[in-house]
Amino acid sequence: MGKPPAWIGPLIEALRHDGSGDYAAAAALRERAMDEAEPSACTVDGVACEWFADGDSRLGPVCEIIANGQYFWLPLESCQGVSLEPPADLRDLVWASGEVLLPNEGRVPVLVPARYPGTAEATGDNADLLKQSRVTEWHEAHPGMWFGMGQRLWSSDVGEHPILDTRLVSFPL
């Protein structure tokens, strides 16, 4: 998928701090990464957006993908587009099928996690809805640092974009 931008390192390191419960250190690393990342202007299903990111603070300007049997973080600034097929069966509530368009105009078939990590273990009143990717709930792990549960939700300056309702995100390069 190419050489990652320098800001990916601090974003990955922040996950290690999340795992140990050191959310303040994770937040500082994420802030540094977000300051360095390029805003990703795009169109989402034909609507122009000045910026676009995953609503989950752990990810922000990256798209989690499975391509060729391997897990990748694809920086949105390194991508020309993401197209997703409409959900057709139960698998699509966990893995959204589609393809990414790379800067060299190569098209790569991908699976994108339709749910956030930990959703399968959800309990409580909305557990079934979360597991079925019908809703998204947010947990503020640290001031200003939000972790999602349930359906993946992309955010932009024009609103929210649930992954299962989104068909095409195009990024100009």
Label for each model-derived stretch:
Residues M1-A6:
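TPR-adjacent "capping" and linker segments in tetratricopeptide-repeat scaffold/adaptor proteins
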Residues L29-E31, A37:
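Inward-facing hydrophobic residues that define packing positions of alpha-helical scaffold repeats
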